[in-house]
A protein has these predicted regions:
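Flavin-dependent oxidoreductase catalytic cores
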Residues: 1-306
Length: 306
């Protein structure tokens, strides 16, 4: 066995965690969760197989602290804790550790959610009218449902571009509290670590390209990273037993000098921010390119042997 390979298999200590080797499974979404975001049998089988195969550290990607319409894991209510405990137990059985990557999407979740629920209610009323033979009400309710859904998609598209600048301080505080509450549930479930998703909303606030706010969360570098540091502090207070890491997205340059990615920090800023994260008690930093969807030309396609 070569020296690099033997190093890969050596144990390492990261914050409070003792990892049996340096083989990690990065955060990604599988779509294997239940409809409410809980961990079901398919998810359990997938992650336990990784742990049984020798992976020492598994990160569950895109875990939402609120009930969104997106098909991602969610740890937003106490009722979901037992399913995440089952996940932790399954992974621990093979000597591995498990982390949750907590994120909040870049849109007004309650606002979009109310519109989606309104569309579903109108569609249900339409089906009831059809069953009763009332074709006029059926047509009217279906038209209402479609119109509400259309407005929901329009709001979602708008928010993905503008929510970072339109969200009130009160909304940002509520999101921070939801993330902290989810971290506390993770600790209760026996999860080992939390990864702060530094892309998405948090990364958009850090970005000099996307963040146009004029309050305490916008403008200077110190203001733009303020929210990220507040989220880190809230997690560490809510779940003091857990290791905390940070996904740090970096905005790179294309050959023509244009930015590659928007939600994140420029390289020089990222270096300064890494020091602030260390001072805030972050145990590990995962560096990634900002907005990886802008990098698809350089991405290995799914299922391609390497």
């Amino acid at each position: 066995m070569t020296a690099p390979a033997s190093k890969l298999l050596q144990p390492i200590t990261v914050g409070p965690l003792e990892l049996k080797n340096r083989i990690m499974f990065p955060p990604l979404t599988t779509g294997y969760e239940e409809r409410d975001g809980s961990i079901g049998e398919r998810s359990l089988a997938f992650y336990e197989r990784l742990a049984r195969g020798g992976v020492s550290y598994i990160v569950i990607g895109d875990v939402a602290p609120v009930m969104t319409a997106s098909p991602t894991p969610k740890l937003a209510t106490d009722a979901q804790i037992p399913t995440f405990k089952a996940l932790a137990d399954a992974v621990h059985k093979h000597g591995a550790k498990v982390a949750l990557q907590l994120f909040h999407p870049e849109y007004d979740v309650p606002g979009v959610g109310r519109m989606v629920m309104g569309s579903m209610a109108a569609a249900k009323a339409a089906q009831e009218a059809k069953a009763a033979g009332d074709e006029e009400t059926f047509a009217a309710k279906m038209a209402e449902s479609n119109e509400i859904r259309k407005r929901a998609y329009a709001k979602l598209h708008h928010d993905m571009q503008h929510f970072v600048n339109e969200a009130s301080v009160e909304q940002l505080t509520q999101i921070e509290e939801a993330i902290a509450a989810s971290a506390a549930r993770a600790q209760q479930a026996g999860i080992d670590a939390i990864e702060v998703h530094g892309d998405r909303l948090v990364g958009s606030l850090c970005s000099a390209i996307l963040n146009k706010r004029t309050d305490e969360y916008g403008g200077s570098f110190e203001n733009r990273v303020r929210y990220a540091l507040e989220v880190v502090a809230a997690i560490k207070e809510a779940a003091p037993e857990l290791m905390v890491e940070y996904k740090l997205p970096v905005i790179m340059e294309n050959p023509d000098g244009t930015p590659r990615g928007k939600g994140g920090l420029l390289p020089d800023e990222a270096c300064e921010f890494a020091k602030l994260l260390e001072g805030a008690g972050i145990d590990m930093i995962q560096v990634a390119q900002a907005n990886h969807t802008g990098n698809m030309g350089d991405t290995i396609p799914p299922m391609l042997p390497v």
